[in-house]
Structures are given as C-alpha cells and as structure tokens.
C-alpha cells in the first residue's frame, strides 16, 4: 500500500486574488492536510476516515476522490481498480484548500500507482478541473501549491499553468481557523461583477510590486504590498472578528494579516518566533469560535504533495 500527503495552502495571499497560492506546514511537524493510501483491488473502493470525515458525503461515489479516480481513468483510457483510504484531516470550507488536498492526494496517488502516465502539466490541469467541480469554476491557486509546493504564481497559459516564486525563508505564518465553514461558492458570489478603475490600478500595482519584492528579496516591501482590494472588502461581513484580529496582530508585530482563500481562516505574517507565538496565543483565545478551531505557526512548505509511506 502506498500513502501520500497533500498539504494545506493559502490562496490569494491577500494581494493575488486567484493567481497566488502557497503550500504551508506547521513548524511542530503536524501534517496539516489530507493523506491518501492506495492499494490494488478487484474494483474501486473508498474508505473515509480522519478528524473531518463526518463533513463529507457518506456515499463514496459522491466524494471528489471517486470523481478524481474516474476522470483519471478516462484520461489514460482504462479502468484501474484500486482501494483508496482518505484521511480527511482538513476542515471543509476553511479557506485552506481542503478540497484541493483531496484532489491532489488522489491524483498524485493514481499517477504514481500507474507509473506516471500523465506529465506534470497534464496532471495539474486535471487537478484544476476537479477542483472546479467543488468551487464552481476552474482555478489553480490551491491545487498548484498543494501539488508542487512553495509559492506559485498562476499563469494558466498553454505552455505553463504555474510558476514558482521565491519567498522569504525566515517568515513565519500564523494560521487561525475559527471552526466555522464558509462556502467557496458563496464567498465568490458576494464579489462584484465590475470593479472601479482605481481598484484595478491599485490591484495591478500591489501584485506587480509584490512579485518584484519577492524576486529582489525585499521582505518589508513585499509585506507592505500585501493588500487586497478585490475580495477582502466584500467578504468582511462574513468575518466579523477579522478586522479586530488584524489590528491586534499589527500591534503585536505582524508584518501583514489577511484572509486565507475565501476564509474564515486568517493568516498573519511574522518576522520571528516570539512575535508568532504571541499572536498565536491571542488568536487562540479571541478568534476561535468552537472546539473545531485551531491555530498553527507555519512555514512555507517547499515539498508539496509527497509520499509518506
């Protein structure tokens, strides 16, 4: 039996709506993401376990993992009977790429099991297609970093879907998931159809400046430019505690704070462990709403999806 892990990811990073995403891992070694095991079988079978398995459909054929298996088999032109076991350790609707974790784990497992019939670009394209079945449209800002690791800039051209961007190895990222669910589709529906010229210019300036700061290794400039004029203003009513948390994090030394993906998870970028620990402790007591919530101090995950046994 082969086992694979697909890590959590932060979509958008505030400044890059639908075009930036980064894989993330807790510094304490916790596997924040989904694990999937695969073994030979006479027919397809899926077992679902894990901390958040009760949030998924009871019928295996309604799970995205089954649809990944089915579409992968269609791509390679033959059915491959396997037994899969999904360990669902990511909360659904958390803003941490939960569906991407399942999609990436399933497709990486199938591609490895079948001796790599799909190349990286073809596999990533299929991942985006499968993610679109959950969120309502094809996008790669979670599946690309979850699969490839690091910070990914989504190009979505004919020759290349995403490009790795250098980040800052000393940055720590505090993630706080309050324990409530926000549907990605619902979070996208609150966004306007049209934006002002001012917002478009500002968005382009912030994103281009952030990419420049990453390549020129200017962390202070990069953090200053992590501003969201596209999604955050319209999603704030769904996150009533966010502004208070961001202000407190800033007072405690955070370089930047934003909404992870569609929310409700927030991230705070910290320059050192002392600051990260202080902010983590505050969020633990003031941002979490129930026992399902959690806070992790994380680093960039440069590995992406990988074999774990």
Curated annotation (Swiss-Prot):
It is found in: Cytoplasm. GO terms for molecular function: ATP binding; homoserine kinase activity. Pathway: Amino-acid biosynthesis; L-threonine biosynthesis; L-threonine from L-aspartate: step 4/5. Pfam families: GHMP_kinases_C (PF08544), GHMP_kinases_N (PF00288). ATP binds at residues 91-101. It is an enzyme of class 2 (transferase). Keywords: Amino-acid biosynthesis, ATP-binding, Cytoplasm, Kinase, Nucleotide-binding, Threonine biosynthesis, Transferase. GO terms for biological process: threonine biosynthetic process. InterPro entries: GHMP_kinase_C_dom (IPR013750), GHMP_kinase_C_sf (IPR036554), GHMP_kinase_N_dom (IPR006204), GHMP_knse_ATP-bd_CS (IPR006203), Homoserine_kinase (IPR000870), Ribosomal_Su5_D2-typ_SF (IPR020568), Ribsml_uS5_D2-typ_fold_subgr (IPR014721). Coiled coil: none annotated. It catalyses: L-homoserine + ATP = O-phospho-L-homoserine + ADP + H(+). Its EC number is 2.7.1.39. Gene3D superfamilies: 3.30.230.10, GHMP kinase, C-terminal domain (3.30.70.890). One of its GO terms (cellular component) is cytoplasm. Catalyzes the ATP-dependent phosphorylation of L-homoserine to L-homoserine phosphate. Belongs to the GHMP kinase family. Homoserine kinase subfamily. This is Homoserine kinase.
